[in-house]
Design a protein with these regions (language model features):
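Short coil/turn linkers that connect adjacent helices within long alpha-helical scaffolds
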Residues: 31-34, 77-79, 165, 180, ...
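Short segments within alpha-helical structural elements
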Residues: 94-119, 255-310
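Residues that define the transmembrane beta-barrel architecture of outer-membrane proteins
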Residues: 154, 185-189
């Protein structure tokens, strides 16, 4: 039985490679934790958005039902035509359909949120108010990702050192047990040293390892550049989304509420027709829906920025 020990430097560099691989695995574990956290927050944002849309369509359906009941009385009294009466029925039916679709989307979002939370039962949050997630305009990419990229390149460099160490003499140790009659249990130990006579095969392996290490360095640098660029883009996008949300909060939402309230009031007083009423209601609803979408876009961007920066 003979066991090769390799060169004196090979075990050392293999140990260095093992430590590097362990550190790389730890960084990858940290990345997975961050991505799981981000995925839960994305699902939470999607749930809040779906819930807000469901509430929006519920309110629109209630308004349409009230206006439809009013239209029935006005049609029976001869104040509106059959065409206007049909338009109001169509509006009520459309709002009901939208509300049902929003409810289905909310159910899907709730199931997805429970799934990413690894829960077998529905997760019912206490606070379901649509709001902006706390976010900071981080300047630096996440050190977890940067370290992971460096560790990947370092593994290839460790492989270069291992291949270089094979230029040195390799040691081996052997043991044998023989039985030569009439003698038994004849044990012997052997120690061997081997020197490479031709270096060309090993030079080729070293050259290949160097090329792989250089490629890994280029890839790591490209990943770092892409990460910095992504963080910068997310930071700019978050700032833009914040301004968009501020526009709705400061002015547009108030105008939408006033538009709907005045349109319903004018219709109740018979000072506007159904066509103008429907147009005003649609405009008001679209503004509130755009606000919900703007908040959702802001929150998703904030989650992405938190994931890739610090």
């Amino acid at each position: 039985m003979e066991q090769s020990l390799g060169s004196l430097l090979t075990p050392h560099y293999k140990n260095v490679l093992a430590k590097t691989m362990t550190a790389t695995g730890e960084r990858y574990r940290d990345i997975v934790k961050r991505e799981i956290t981000a995925e839960v927050k994305r699902a939470w944002c999607e749930y809040l958005s779906a819930l807000a849309l469901c509430r929006l369509w519920q309110g629109e359906e209630q308004t349409a039902k009230r206006l439809r009941e009013m239209s029935v009385l006005r049609y029976e009294q001869g104040d509106i035509s059959k065409l206007e009466y049909s338009m109001m029925n169509t509006l009520a039916a459309e709002q009901h359909t939208k509300r049902v679709q929003a409810q289905d989307q909310l159910t899907v979002a709730a199931k997805r949120f429970a799934w990413v939370c690894r829960s077998t039962e529905p997760v019912v949050p206490e606070d379901t108010l649509l709001s902006l997630l706390p976010a900071t305009l981080c300047e630096q990419p996440s050190a977890t990702y940067l370290t992971y990229f460096d560790m990947q390149a370092r593994q290839k460099q460790d492989m270069v050192n291992i291949e270089k160490s094979k230029f040195f003499p390799e040691f081996s140790i052997g043991y044998s047990l023989q039985k030569i009659a009439p003698l038994t249990n004849l044990s012997s130990w052997s120690v061997g040293v081997s020197f490479p006579l031709l270096f060309f095969p090993q030079k080729s392996r070293v050259k290949q390892a160097k090329m792989e290490a250089l490629s890994a360095q280029f890839e790591a640098e490209e990943n770092r550049t892409q990460l910095r660029r992504k963080v910068e883009e997310l930071r700019d996008k978050l700032s833009m989304n914040a301004k968009n949300v501020a526009y709705y909060v400061d002015a547009a939402l108030h105008e939408a509420d006033e538009l709907q309230r005045n349109a319903v009031l004018l219709y109740e007083e018979s000072e506007t027709d159904i066509a103008e009423l429907v147009q005003s209601l649609n405009t008001s609803r679209d503004i509130r829906k755009q606000y919900i979408d703007a908040v959702h876009e802001y929150n998703v961007t904030a989650v992405e920025l938190e994931l890739y920066s610090e």
